[in-house]
Structures are given as structure tokens and as C-alpha cells.
């Protein structure tokens, strides 16, 4: 069985991500320090909360340098995806810079609520193993006030008063702005695709 490390970055979605993995037949290893990453074939960085608090927790856990050196597939979920980028406007905090780009606050408008909460359509941009067998027109469940504008690493977008990156993949570094653990069959498919993707 593939060893999956699930990082405890203090997010409230940790339990639901773990349960989603268990439904796929995977019992993840909960990780709170660098030693927990040893031997992992896949790493998942979930997150709910603020970027400054999450980065401080990763630093206190001694996980920043190990994440920067990581060679196996890594996926960030919701705030976890945002932490993969260079910088977040939320608290004006430097992030992991594993992917190029900056996290911006969503702009509210009369018909656009922030935070963005609920189901929204995924708009594929290019081929990716993460999107294998995900049907056209599939939707996912979002809860966020910050997002990454479209980048060259984006493989799917979402429109909420403007387009933003919904799924990102650059080599083995991946991210989902939505909550796959709350996105029914679409979310389960994307998690399975991540677990099965080529590690090269």
C-alpha cells in the first residue's frame, strides 16, 4: 500500500480528509514533524484558517525545509494549495514558493459574495493526470476568501467574479483550491488520481 503522509497543519478539515482517504482504502499517516515525512510516497497538505497561522505552524513543526526538498507527489488542499505559492495577501506572508504565483483576496461585488462558499463548476484548461475520468461540467465544493489568479501551472479554473486557479499541477506539485473531501464523486476521483499519479 502507498504510504500517504497527511500533514497536521491545524486545519479543521484534517479529519474529513482522513476519512475521504479511508473511503479510498488508504489509512494516512498523520504528520506533525519532519520525521513523519520519511518513507512517504505521497504527501497531503490540507488547511483551513489563515495563511500566517498555517505558515507559523509549519515552521514550528520543522516542516518547511523538508517540504521544499520533497521529491514525491504533494497536493495542497484549500489553504494548503495557497501555501504552495510564493506569497499571500492574507497577512502579507511569504509562503513555500514551490509554485510561482501570489495569492490574492477575492473581490466582492453586488452579485459576488466573499467568502466564496458552495458548489461551482470546474473549467479544465489543459490535460492533467488529476483530471482523468473527471466528467466535463463537474463541480466541486469551495469555501475561501483568497485565491490564486490563473497561472501557467493551472490545469482547471473556476469563475467567481473572475477566473482563478481551481486545480494546479507542476510536475509532482499539485493543489486543489476546493475541498475534494467534500466534493462527492468528483472529489474522490481527484484524490484517487493524485494517489495513482506517476511519481516521476
UniProtKB/Swiss-Prot annotation:
UniProt-listed PROSITE patterns: GATASE_TYPE_1
Gene name for this UniProt entry: hisH
One GO MF term: glutaminase activity
InterPro entries associated with the record: Class_I_gatase-like, GATASE, Imidazole-glycPsynth_HisH
Keyword annotations from UniProtKB, A to Z: Amino-acid biosynthesis, Cytoplasm, Glutamine amidotransferase, Histidine biosynthesis, Hydrolase, Lyase
Job description of the protein: IGPS catalyzes the conversion of PRFAR and glutamine to IGP, AICAR and glutamate. The HisH subunit catalyzes the hydrolysis of glutamine to glutamate and ammonia as part of the synthesis of IGP and AICAR. The resulting ammonia molecule is channeled to the active site of HisF.
Domain of life according to the entry: Bacteria
One of the GO biological process terms: L-histidine biosynthetic process
The keyword Signal belongs to this UniProt entry's keyword annotation: no
Documented EC number(s): 4.3.2.10, 3.5.1.2
Pathway(s) served: Amino-acid biosynthesis; L-histidine biosynthesis; L-histidine from 5-phospho-alpha-D-ribose 1-diphosphate: step 5/9
UniProt-listed SUPFAM superfamilies: Class I glutamine amidotransferase-like
Alphabetized Pfam families for the sequence: GATase
Reaction equation(s) it catalyzes: 5-[(5-phospho-1-deoxy-D-ribulos-1-ylimino)methylamino]-1-(5-phospho-beta-D-ribosyl)imidazole-4-carboxamide + L-glutamine = D-erythro-1-(imidazol-4-yl)glycerol 3-phosphate + 5-amino-1-(5-phospho-beta-D-ribosyl)imidazole-4-carboxamide + L-glutamate + H(+); L-glutamine + H2O = L-glutamate + NH4(+)
HAMAP family: HisH
UniProt key word ATP-binding: no
UniProt subunit comment: Heterodimer of HisH and HisF.
Domain called Glutamine amidotransferase type-1: residue spans: 3-200
GO CC, alphabetical: cytoplasm
Subcellular location, record wording: Cytoplasm
Protein name (Swiss-Prot/TrEMBL): Imidazole glycerol phosphate synthase subunit HisH
Active site: 78 (nucleophile), 179, 181
Amino acid at each position: 500500500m502507498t504510504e500517504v503522509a497527511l500533514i497536521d497543519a491545524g486545519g479543521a478539515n484534517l479529519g474529513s480528509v482522513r476519512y475521504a482517504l479511508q473511503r479510498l482504502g488508504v489509512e494516512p499517516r498523520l504528520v506533525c514533524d519532519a520525521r513523519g515525512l520519511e518513507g512517504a510516497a505521497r504527501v497531503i497538505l490540507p488547511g483551513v484558517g489563515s495563511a500566517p497561522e498555517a505558515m507559523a505552524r509549519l515552521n514550528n513543526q520543522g516542516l518547511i525545509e523538508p517540504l521544499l526538498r520533497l521529491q514525491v507527489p504533494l497536493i495542497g488542499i484549500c489553504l494548503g494549495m495557497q501555501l504552495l505559492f510564493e506569497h499571500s495577501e492574507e497577512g502579507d506572508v511569504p509562503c513555500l514558493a514551490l509554485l510561482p504565483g501570489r495569492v490574492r483576496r477575492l473581490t466582492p461585488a453586488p452579485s459576488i459574495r466573499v467568502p466564496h462558499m458552495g458548489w461551482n463548476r470546474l473549467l479544465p484548461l489543459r490535460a492533467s493526470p488529476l483530471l482523468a475520468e473527471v466528467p466535463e461540467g463537474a463541480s466541486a465544493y469551495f469555501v475561501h476568501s483568497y485565491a490564486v489568479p490563473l497561472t501557467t501551472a493551472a490545469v482547471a479554473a473556476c469563475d467567481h467574479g473572475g477566473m482563478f486557479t481551481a486545480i494546479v499541477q507542476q510536475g509532482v506539485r499539485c493543489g486543489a483550491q476546493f475541498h475534494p473531501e467534500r466534493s462527492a464523486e468528483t472529489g474522490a476521483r481527484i484524490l484517487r488520481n493524485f494517489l495513482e499519479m506517476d511519481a516521476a
